[in-house]
Amino acid sequence: MFHLGWFLGSGFGIQPWNPAGGDGVYTGANMRDWMKPDLYVDLAASLERACFDYILIEDTAMVEDSYNGSAEVSLRRGFMAPKNDPMPLVPLMTQRTKHIGIVPTVSTIQYHPYLAARLYTTLDHLTEGRVGMNVVTSVTDRVAQNFGYDQHFDHDERYKMAEEWVEVVKQLQHSWDVDAVIADDVNGIYADHTKVHPINFEGKYFRSRGPLNTIPGPQRDIPVVSAGGSVPGRELAARHGDTQMAMCKTVEDMKAYREDIHRRMLAHGRKPSDIKLLFLATPIVAPTDAEAQEKAEALRRYRYTDAAVEYNLWNMSYTSGGRIDFGSIDLDTPVDQIDLSKGNGERSSIANLFQDTEGKTLREVAAESFQITDLGLVGSPDTVAAKMEEIMDEVGGDGFLLYSPMTRHSIAEIADGLAPALKRRGAIRDGYTYTTLNENIHEF
């Protein structure tokens, strides 16, 4: 069996709302209601019925203005903004569910480790052990400037900072011994003070005395999720990750990625089974194979439209950390002439976008290259389920992190079409053995 997760790629932000902008005809009331909890609560209930492990909620705290030197496109089309803080949404998403995990993103420059440790421990209690933390370093200078920095740290230094951040959080999570809470109402003793300890951490980036003033939650150690595919990002996952989002375009890339992470884990004294790698994919599902192929062809044609090219150029600018304005580059420029080294953002994502693009122009890359691909998962539910099983058999595991436009129609295609087909094949779980996210991730 393999695992399934859902990537809520727009975070607690505006969801697909614009049929004229390529969002399709099933956008419903997203434009008016994206900031209300109902859509997300329904998502959690649907995906628990489908037996997903977790929902990963993207987040970033800025209004992007590097594309054409303006926030005009970002705000006109709703790219990355507006967006709400996902943390208050987490307990709401667990109210109609009992098992599925909710993994909000936390940035190591936005949250001090003490604040994060206290917040996630609180969420661990409120969700009864179903929260995880998606640890990111943030991408752009604009995020850093919103939190008091002149500009963002260089890429590799961000990950050194993140390593230290995770270490502080983990020490704080263990600042209460497992038997520190006595809860003796007869003798009037709540906790044993000798079993609650300062951590007195002093590092290059963070200092914290501790202890936490919250008691350990059901999981105690909140599962760590990460997404970085660069060498420092892989090292972070190998040292601390419980599950990782992996972005690959081919089965060969997936196998190589998994083998590399496992080698790094062994070097850090961890077992490869300690982490579950979920590969990003956008399956294209329809009632029949022919209809799915028609959807895929329509999507391919749309990618050459001005609206789609504008989005991809905008996304490239953002992904570079806001350091390269792809809107200012002539579309007929050969990509070999573009200096990508100036970027300071998602290094592996930029590499993914420009993989195998030698001899192409920026126009061609903007129309043909996307960070998340379908991995060949195009067809009826049974066809896609068989292909997913085939890929996992070849790669060796551990599962898929599915990304699809956030509409009730697309959710139903996965939860009520694809997932039942996978269950019939015995490819995914048909129920939950445990109640906490940590246990469900590591069950198999």
Give residue ranges: language-model regions:
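Catalytic cores of nucleotide-enabled group-transfer and carboxylate-activating enzymes in metabolic
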Residues: 62-63, 82-85, 92-105, 223-226, ...
